[in-house]
From Swiss-Prot:
This is Taste receptor type 2 member 4. It comes from Pan troglodytes. The gene is TAS2R4. The keyword Hydrolase does not apply. Keywords: Cell membrane, Cell projection, Cilium, G-protein coupled receptor, Glycoprotein, Membrane, Receptor, Sensory transduction, Taste, Transducer, Transmembrane, Transmembrane helix. Glycans are attached at residues 164-165. Its main location: membrane.
Length: 299
């Protein structure tokens, strides 16, 4: 039964990966076409372009790894498996930092706080986006190198077999590996939660101001608040189980876990990127309009 459930999870992950690849290819092509036509690109579209390329490569690598894992009859090469893990970890970390940067940009541009820090960020964040994107890549490279260093210093735990189940002896090296992975993702989580909280607070202030002035509170600024807030909240809903599942998959003793746990981790790890990419298309006016035109043309 568990074997069938695991096989179903693999099929579901392959389908979701195909969806994610198509969605991110669409995001990349639309933004690239706009960039070539107008010879300029907005800060948010520049981030989306980088995010689309990164996720396209990441999901493609994940799909190749899944197909190779299922179709391979012989034992997998340790070096090839390590290559897949490290490339995926780097691309995954880069894409998460790109999303974090996108949420920061939305928060700074849409909120109407008059604090000097926010006013300074409003003026300076857009010209700094290329450098911030490079910083995201460098942070991801550093995180991946840190993972390599700690995993080399952390030997695989020895299996301790009992009559009922199999347990693992977790040593201090593995605990340091877990701590490094948690710390690398906790900063992203804190920034994203803070951005969403500031957006919600700004939206509440905006609605109160509109009500006090006896005017309709649903205007373009309110719509921008709500759209960005929805994207951030849905991102967090997808991101939290995804980060837990991915953390478990990176641990050395993941290979010894039962198929039920592996299946759940696989589904949560695969659902995030395609789901968030679809949300980006739905909430982005230009991408949404282009997608509607393509669907209407096909009909």
């Amino acid at each position: 039964m568990l074997r069938l459930f695991y096989f179903s999870a693999i099929i579901a992950s392959v389908i979701l990966n195909f969806v994610g690849i198509i969605m991110n290819l669409f995001i990349t092509v639309v933004n690239c076409k706009t960039w070539v036509k107008s010879h300029r690109i907005s800060s948010s579209d520049r981030i989306l372009f980088s995010l689309g390329i990164t996720r396209f490569l990441m999901l493609g690598l994940f799909l190749v790894n899944t197909i190779y894992f299922v179709s391979s009859n012989x034992e997998r090469s340790v070096y090839l498996s390590a290559f897949f893990v490290l490339c995926f970890m780097f691309l995954d970390s880069s894409s998460l930092w790109f999303v974090t940067l996108l949420n920061i940009l939305y928060c700074v541009k849409i909120t109407n706080f008059q604090h000097s820090v926010f006013l300074l960020l409003k003026r300076n964040i857009s010209p700094k986006i290329p450098r911030l994107l490079l910083a995201c890549v460098l942070i991801s490279a550093f995180t991946t190198c840190l993972y390599i260093t700690l995993s080399q210093a952390s030997p695989f735990p020895e299996l301790v077999t009992t009559r009922n189940n199999t347990s693992f002896n977790i040593n201090e090296g593995i605990l340091s590996l877990v701590v490094s992975l948690v710390l690398s993702s906790s900063l992203q989580f804190i920034i994203n939660v803070t951005s969403a909280s500031l957006l919600i607070h700004s939206l509440r202030r905006h609605i109160q101001k509109m009500q006090k002035n006896a005017t309709g509170f649903w205007n373009p600024q309110t719509e921008a608040h709500v759209g960005a807030m929805k994207l951030m909240v849905y991102f967090l809903i997808l991101y939290i189980p995804y980060s837990v599942a991915t953390l478990v998959q990176y641990l050395p003793f993941y290979a010894g876990m039962d198929m039920g746990t592996k299946s759940i981790c696989l589904i949560f790890a695969t659902l995030y990127s395609p789901g968030h990419s679809v949300l980006i298309i739905i909430t982005h006016p230009k991408l949404k309009t282009t997608a509607k035109k393509i669907l209407c043309f096909k009909k």
